[in-house]
Amino acid sequence: MSSPNKPIPLDIAIIGGGSAGMALATKLDNLSATVFEPKTAAERDCSWALWAQPQQLEEFSPAIRGSWDQWRLIDHSGEIIHQSNQYRYTSLSSGQYLQHCEAGLKDSVSLVRAPIESIVSQGSGGQFSADGQTYSAKTIYDSRPPILDDNSLRQHFVGWEISTKEPIEHADIATLMDFRVDQSRGLHFIYVLPYSDRHLLVESTMISTQLEDKDWYRKAISQWLTERNIQIQSKLREEYGVIPMVPVQPQNADIACIGAAGGAVRLSSGYGLSTIQAQMAVLAESIAAGEYRVPMPFSKRLVFMDKVFNRALDTQSDHGVELFMATAKTLNADQFARFMLGTAGSMEWAKVVLAMPKWPFIKSALKQFLSHD
């Protein structure tokens, strides 16, 4: 190994070995690249989800835990069920996906299991240290979690993976949002993925600016299960997450950011895996052609519309259930999947806008336009 005082030269350094970092790393070839990630894939294992098409199902197959061609949204008035021939709502093990990526790295790409320290930016690259060794990279991509404002709109949740004493009903349908829960603190719903009729993931999810104590989410999960007479045989694991629903600030403004840190999470839905994968595929092709700039994940129009949608959620949360249910009602399954992924066309957007509660949406649009944000 080189002396810590003599920098190891790299063509590309990728800071963070999550979805974006590893997706890019697996697509690099004939370049000396290193991923810097302190935690193992198993240590970071959690549930990821996306609407997957056949090619993606094949790509993600080593990590798929469940896949459904039906999904639903529920409120006190009833339920909306979608069934798709083009998309499957798919749950992945992030740990298994990252392990698969690590196993597929080319010989020219390495993995350093350590955090990076003290970046000194130099153009698109820079110099930094990790595990006592100094590195000098021509290009750096940072995929570390972004910095979040404590008062920003976020999607936050606690989830339990459980086995049940008795078979559950509707094990062939993913429940994306069940709004029949306490709405007093912001938009709140239960999210349920049945991996089988006795094995499921249940999450209590909030969309608000205020994070709750973890016991609050746990109580909501317990109450939801009790009301449906679902008895837990064993609790397999618990996960906790916070997803930004506003533009994010990178940890280092001088370094190119990718993934969530680069704005690749859809602001109004919290879905980002498909966008991240697409962004990294385009970036890898660009790098092979000698272009290192990170492509924009979403159009300016989509970002504006998401900000309008989220402003309505933030300032008039009592309309939140109506906003999501109206969206699901006006779109068919494939249109809804595209809308949540951020790939909906103009006609689909027009249908959503026309279905929205008019005054809250117009008011939010005007405020967003005048804010110049």
Locations of the language-model features?
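Redox-cofactor binding/interface segments in oxidoreductases and associated redox assembly factors
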Residues: 15, 141-143, 257-259
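Conserved Rossmann-like nucleotide-cofactor binding loop
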Residues: 20, 41, 146
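Predominantly flavin-linked oxidoreductase catalytic cores and closely associated redox partners
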Residues: 104-232, 250-251
